[in-house]
Amino acid sequence: MRDSRETFVNHAFVTGYPIKHSRSPLIHGYWLKQFGIAGSYRAHEVTPEAFPEFMGQLRDGGTGFCGGNVTIPHKEMAFELSDRPDELSAELGAANTLWLEDGRICATNTDGRGFVANLDERASGWDRISTAVILGAGGASRAVIQAVRDRGVKTIHVVNRTAARAQELADRFGRAVHAHPIAALSEVMAGAGLFVNTTSLGMDGEPAPAIDFSPLANGAVVTDIVYVPLKTPLLRQAEEQGYRIVDGLGMLLHQAAPGFEKWFGLRPVVDETLRQIIIKDMDVHA
């Protein structure tokens, strides 16, 4: 089987709408330079209306890309239009990583892998817990629920302002997942070992939630998939109450690694130098 690296000359992309804010080119550019690969990775903005045509051109070789990343709002359409989605993306109904094999578009979703890799790096032993609480039931929560469940967490409470959306996720991901309205947050936090914020609350310009983390288990981990600001008000509150915290930047970095390996043939490492490059860019564009 010929893979895409034999057909195309190591050119990959990230697409979304808008996309100019993406830090993915910085991440992959760092790895390309580190490995001395004469390839490229660039942002390629595509509107939702033009995305089906873009996927057709990718399949036919008209874009010159061997694959790439897909972000908001194209993840669901990327899954639907791919030829060979894997089980991860099929369960999520969304793909964020595409590559070509024999003229077919293959698809996966690395968000969940990025999430747990970040926890593994920054909160070793987190997966010895039995109960997790996930705040939010939007698209970002799906990969987190899937990844936490697949690491063996037996009880996952999904809390959302609209309980019906949380119930949709419970129905999708099986018996380990339980849906709750926001009024039940404190109750379901009791004894939990992991708290995950998958909402935009606490992002720059967004109001921060007032959450008392004291019902959590001693030594619990609180993490936020938001990484701007790096330490969100929610994480500050958890830290002040004595809990281990993990920011969301590592998820962004770790989810990028599997795609790079698909397109360029080498497995990159998420190191502190890369992390500091992204933090510096965040400071410059704050």
Curated annotation (Swiss-Prot):
**Pathway linked to the protein:** Metabolic intermediate biosynthesis; chorismate biosynthesis; chorismate from D-erythrose 4-phosphate and phosphoenolpyruvate: step 4/7
Which keywords has UniProt assigned to this entry? Amino-acid biosynthesis, Aromatic amino acid biosynthesis, NADP, Oxidoreductase
Work out whether the entry's keyword set contains Membrane.
no
- CDD domains for this protein: NAD_bind_Shikimate_DH (cd01065)
Per the UniProt record, one Pfam family is Shikimate_dh_N
| Active site location | K75 (proton acceptor)
Q: Name one GO cellular component term.
A: cytosol
UniProt-annotated binding residues for shikimate:
S22, R23, S24, T71, N96, D111, Y227
Reactions catalysed, as given in the entry: shikimate + NADP(+) = 3-dehydroshikimate + NADPH + H(+)
Q: What is its EC number?
A: 1.1.1.25
Q: How does it assemble?
A: Homodimer.
What is the stated purpose of this protein? Answer: Involved in the biosynthesis of the chorismate, which leads to the biosynthesis of aromatic amino acids. Catalyzes the reversible NADPH linked reduction of 3-dehydroshikimate (DHSA) to yield shikimate (SA).
Matching entries from PANTHER family are given as: BIFUNCTIONAL 3-DEHYDROQUINATE DEHYDRATASE_SHIKIMATE DEHYDROGENASE, CHLOROPLASTIC (PTHR21089:SF1), SHIKIMATE DEHYDROGENASE (PTHR21089)
Name it.
Answer: Shikimate dehydrogenase (NADP(+))
